[in-house]
Structures are given as structure tokens and as C-alpha cells.
Swiss-Prot record:
Tissue expression: Selectively expressed on hematopoietic progenitor cells and the small vessel endothelium of a variety of tissues.
Signal peptide: 1-31
Modifications the protein undergoes after translation, according to the UniProt entry: Highly glycosylated. Phosphorylated on serine residues by PKC.
Biased composition (Low complexity): 144-159
Keyword Secreted in annotation: no
Organism this protein belongs to: Homo sapiens (Human)
Primary localisation category: membrane
Protein name: Hematopoietic progenitor cell antigen CD34
GO cellular component: apical plasma membrane; basal plasma membrane; cytoplasm; external side of plasma membrane; extracellular region; glomerular endothelium fenestra; intercellular bridge; lysosome
Membrane topology of this protein: Single-pass type I membrane protein
TM region(s), chain numbering: 291-311
A GO MF term: sulfate binding
Record topological domains on the Cytoplasmic side: 312-385
Length: 385
């Protein structure tokens, strides 16, 4: 029986002795045997401290490794918890690192160590949180390769938060109040108010809100400070509740009308009930003196026109005011009554008429005697006939 047991134990004995020989051949600096026969790695520890970046500063120590190589992990010197202050743009980040070591016993193998680092950041609402990525690389530990677990920490840079919405305080608007008679432009938008107020009062109370509605989107598209929004307001003389927004051209008027329709609820909060495109001239009132002057000028022009019309129709009048072809007898006898020789006329009247005709034919206008000779001598002309 003893021989059989020795024969059976014979093949097993070299395997046990081989394992003991291999363990005894290991360097004393890396491995040591305890009383139970379990191999325990002796881990050298080296501590170093360095600054990672210009804006982020924290302390670093090394994690022990069985091969003598060190890997950097952000831990503290005094315990498992560390507080790290990261200063960038006057914002403080609080980082807490906790290291948990897990040991596992395996037969004929080296204990593997795994470090888990958890980082907690406390940040304000408007500041972006830096992203922390843990990249573990795990490999089983055994006698042949003598490797341990290492964990690397990667931190992304912090970017400041930028809001895309336009800041209302950066809107630069200039509102001018002008008289309706001083405006040289012809087109505008009538802002119908819920109550009568002057241009100065509207500018003081609700001018900022109107500039926010009409100039907010324009300055959001343009660069900051590159353009100043200018608005020209004029008080209507015909309708006191209408405040005219005078614009340069029809293209600008159409764009403003579309913008007002889009923000109609905001305009109602400002007391603007309605808005329509109207002419500037229709809101100018004329004074009483102007009306009197216009009526007087029209009356004088009418009188002069009527007088000229009648003067042009009277062709018998010369420019000097004398009638053409007149003689004293024609005037005395009612305009040519002496020329007619009716049956009831006397012979003396017929004789006078013939005398007058003879005088007109001679062109002298002087009465001739009955014997054919005139009482006055004829004037001889200077030139020969």
C-alpha cells in the first residue's frame, strides 16, 4: 500500500516543488512569502507634485505599481479626500476625489489594485462644467507579467458661457421729436395711441420700449456698436392721438410694418392700439390767416379775369380808350340815324346827311357848303400826291 501511495504521489511532487522553486527565485524586492505561503507584492511608492496648466493648479501623487512604473492621479497627501480650487474667470470649482482600493487574492498570482476616482464639481448656472473622463485600463495580474491596474484622468478645458439672445441694455437708439411742418419727408406710419400725449411725453415714458421693438432685431443681426437706430417722431396737428413715425422710403416703411405686426402685443402694452401708413401732408392744419389770404387772392384773380374778358370782347375800343371812326354828328344823332332817308324825313335832314357823307369821304370831318366848297381851306400835305 505504501508503495502504491508513493507511486501515486510521485508525479504530483515535482509540480509542487517546481512552484516552490519558482517562487523562491523571484527577486526579494518584488515578492515576499508570508507564513501562509501566499505571495504578496511589495509596492514601492514615489511621490511627486506638479502643476498641470496655467489656469488649473492641484497636487498630484503617484499610485504604486508592481513593475516600478508610476502613473499620475490627482489625490491628496493627508487622506482620501482632497479639495481642489480651479480658478478661471472668477469662478470657483470644488473637486472631491475619493480613491477606493480593491484587493483580490488569487492562487499563484499577484494582487491587482484598481483605483477609482470620482470628481464632483459645483458650478454656477451660467458657467459650463468641465468634462472629466476616466479611462481605466485593466489587466489581470499574474506571476508571469506582474502587471497592475492603472487609471488615467483627462480633463477638458473650460469654455465660458455665451448667451445668443440680444442684451437689451446694449441697444443704441436715438429718438427725435420734430414739428410736422418741419418734416421734409412725405410718408410715415401713424401710431394711434390710447390717450393723447405729446411727442416729448411719449419719448420719456415709452420711447425705450418702442426702440426695443423696432431696433432690437436690427442690432442683433449687426455687430455691437456698429449701427445706431434712429427714429423720427412728429405730432399730428389734425389728430392729436396720432404720432407719426417718419421714414425715408417705402421699403423701410414696409419692413417696419411687418415688424410691428409681429410684435403687436408688445405695442399694445406700450399704449399703441393701431398703426397705418399715411401721408405727412394730411396731418398738417392751415391757420385762419392762411385761409383768409388764399380766399382774397382767389377773389382778386377772379375780378381781373372777368375784366380782361370783357375788354377783349369790346373790339370797338382802342387801347387808349377812344372809339374808332367816330364823328360828332354820329354821336349826336344816336349812332347813324342821319344816314337813313326814310319817307318821313325832311329835306333838310337829307341834306345834312349828304353833307356828312361828303365830309367823311374827304377825311377832314368838316362840314362843306352847299355849293361844294368848304368854309375852311384844305391843309396841303408836305409831299406831292
Amino acid at each position: 500500500m505504501l508503495v502504491r501511495r508513493g507511486a501515486r504521489a510521485g508525479p504530483r511532487m515535482p509540480r509542487g516543488w517546481t512552484a516552490l522553486c519558482l517562487l523562491s527565485l523571484l527577486p526579494s524586492g518584488f515578492m515576499s512569502l508570508d507564513n501562509n505561503g501566499t505571495a504578496t507584492p511589495e509596492l514601492p511608492t514615489q511621490g511627486t507634485f506638479s502643476n498641470v496648466s496655467t489656469n488649473v493648479s492641484y497636487q498630484e501623487t503617484t499610485t504604486p505599481s508592481t513593475l516600478g512604473s508610476t502613473s499620475l492621479h490627482p489625490v491628496s497627501q493627508h487622506g482620501n479626500e482632497a479639495t481642489t480650487n480651479i480658478t478661471e474667470t472668477t469662478v470657483k470649482f470644488t473637486s472631491t476625489s475619493v480613491i477606493t482600493s480593491v484587493y483580490g487574492n488569487t492562487n499563484s498570482s499577484v494582487q491587482s489594485q484598481t483605483s477609482v476616482i470620482s470628481t464632483v464639481f459645483t458650478t454656477p448656472a451660467n458657467v459650463s462644467t468641465p468634462e472629466t473622463t476616466l479611462k481605466p485600463s485593466l489587466s489581470p495580474g499574474n506571476v508571469s507579467d506582474l502587471s497592475t491596474t492603472s487609471t488615467s484622468l483627462a480633463t477638458s478645458p473650460t469654455k465660458p458661457y455665451t448667451s445668443s439672445s440680444p442684451i437689451l441694455s446694449d441697444i443704441k437708439a436715438e429718438i427725435k421729436c420734430s414739428g410736422i411742418r418741419e418734416v421734409k419727408l412725405t410718408q410715415g406710419i401713424c401710431l394711434e395711441q390710447n390717450k393723447t400725449s405729446s411727442c416729448a411725453e411719449f419719448k420719456k415714458d415709452r420711447g425705450e420700449g418702442l426702440a426695443r421693438v423696432l431696433c432690437g432685431e436690427e442690432q442683433a443681426d449687426a455687430d455691437a456698436g456698429a449701427q445706431v437706430c434712429s427714429l423720427l417722431l412728429a405730432q399730428s396737428e389734425v389728430r392729436p392721438q396720432c404720432l407719426l413715425l417718419v421714414l425715408a422710403n417705402r421699403t423701410e416703411i414696409s419692413s417696419k410694418l411687418q415688424l410691428m405686426k409681429k410684435h403687436q402685443s408688445d405695442l399694445k402694452k406700450l399704449g399703441i392700439l393701431d398703426f397705418t401708413e399715411q401721408d405727412v401732408a394730411s396731418h398738417q392744419s392751415y391757420s385762419q390767416k392762411t385761409l383768409i389770404a388764399l380766399v382774397t387772392s382767389g377773389a382778386l384773380l377772379a375780378v381781373l379775369g372777368i375784366t380782361g374778358y370783357f375788354l377783349m370782347n369790346r373790339r370797338s375800343w382802342s387801347p387808349t380808350g377812344e372809339r374808332l371812326g367816330e364823328d360828332p354828328y354820329y354821336t349826336e344823332n344816336g349812332g347813324g340815324q342821319g344816314y337813313s332817308s326814310g319817307p318821313g324825313t325832311s329835306p333838310e335832314a337829307q341834306g345834312k346827311a349828304s353833307v356828312n357823307r361828303g365830309a367823311q369821304e374827304n377825311g377832314t370831318g368838316q362840314a362843306t357848303s352847299r355849293n361844294g366848297h368848304s368854309a375852311r381851306q384844305h391843309v396841303v400835305a408836305d409831299t406831292e400826291l
